[in-house]
Amino acid sequence: DELYNQIQSVIDEKGDDFEMCFFHCLSRLPDTKEGTLEKVKWISSTKCYLVNVNNMKKYNKYFYPMDNHVDMKHEDLIAKGARVYYKDLREYMIIDRTHKSMIGHNGHGRRNYFSRQYPDATPDDVKWGY
């Protein structure tokens, strides 16, 4: 299956030099381009991903306390040095959108605010997916 071939190509390209790579997201704040991958500063609404479990062990402590949805914890990990990438593989997957999100969202009164690490970034800075 081509999806698995594409994911394997990321493993072949990065080896052990990454913590996470996402293949689907609704929005992201790009950083730099590295080979076929886009390094990100912030990413949200991820559905398909590759995690280097051994490299992620050093970041486990930053998941606690779980004071935010796990998608929003990624920016904290990136701020601590985690190498997080995105590669658009949506042409190889089908996302079931027949149900509403089960994720609780908190009304904070700041419509353009989305990141603790980048509080001055606005939705205009975000690269949107699908």
Language model: regions and residue ranges:
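An acidic/histidine-cluster motif and surrounding catalytic segment
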Residues: 2-130
